[in-house]
């Protein structure tokens, strides 16, 4: 009979040495991002990257509510204002220059959206927290000036979240899909016929084909082209001018890239991820008129700071509503 010390034994080697091993996507084209700018030596939950018409970068930190403005040429960091609403999660810029800020509130039922100037003045409630039960995480404008937003509620066995469309007059809210678990990132294809949505706690990517009215789903048009693996799950996303989709993987320190049909075609790794550093990658966004992608992440679990990283993507970023 074989002694215990002679039994076959598992060892940590190869992929099992990583804090966040990549299994199903290990054969994809893979590049590692370069550090671009340190936002803070403190771990801040960075999110909401968006560029204005002058090429200035806006972003926020969720838990403290700081709104940051960065000059990409000088790397100067300013903090023009602090959100008056709890747990802001995304910034989108209207073509009139106003910032639309999504906020999560109490993470249960007090989220909403407000608009303000870049200095935080002239605040207008777009979706009020006291008259709805949404927990709003992200949004994307269409060319008419309406927008889609994600409802971040629920968990894996209690899918309360969904996706809604708000008409350009901001008065009518129409449900697109419902009963999903923590709807998070959202992006709209160049022709505005395909809506992409990430479902974080179910680890799924939704591809929703829309009719011309922008709210009716085409027959058999709501599909799930991809199931992610690992903890935690897909976060914010954006498209490039080839209609490729870039999805930040929260808790994994990487960005996955999909073609317009939802097939994975590449991935971007954050340095230090195998050792468990900078895993909270939340949002990718292109510098306008370039293929240079900026990615935000932080190292809260390991006591590190908050960083922006950069790579070149497959194509230039898509010039969305604020540039039209």
From Swiss-Prot:
Q: What positions does the entry give for Ca(2+) 2 binding?
A: 109, 111, 129, 132, 134
Q: Cite the EC number.
A: 3.1.1.-
Supply the Pfam families for this chain.
Answer: SGL (PF08450)
Q: Which top-rank group of organisms is this from?
A: Bacteria
One Gene Ontology molecular-function label = metal ion binding
Give the main localization category: cytoplasm
Residues noted as binding Ca(2+) 1 in the record, renumbered to the chain: 47, 137, 184, 235-236
Sorted UniProt keywords: Calcium, Cytoplasm, Hydrolase, Metal-binding
| Free-text remark on how the cofactor is bound | Binds 2 Ca(2+) ions per subunit.
Listed Gene3D superfamilies: TolB, C-terminal domain
Task: Give the subcellular location.
Answer: Cytoplasm
Q: Name one GO cellular component term.
A: cytoplasm
Do you know which SUPFAM superfamilies this protein is assigned to? Answer: Calcium-dependent phosphotriesterase
Active site positions, chain numbering: 235 (proton donor)
Swiss-Prot/TrEMBL cofactor(s)? Ca(2+)
Q: Which InterPro entries match?
A: 6-blade_b-propeller_TolB-like, SGL, SMP-30/CGR1_Lactonase
Family assignment from sequence similarity = Belongs to the SMP-30/CGR1 family.
Main function = Exhibits lactonase activity. Acts in cells with perturbed membrane integrity and is possibly related to the membrane homeostasis.
**UniProt-recorded name of the protein:** Lactonase drp35
Species the sequence originates in = Staphylococcus aureus (strain MSSA476)
Give me the gene this protein comes from. Answer: drp35
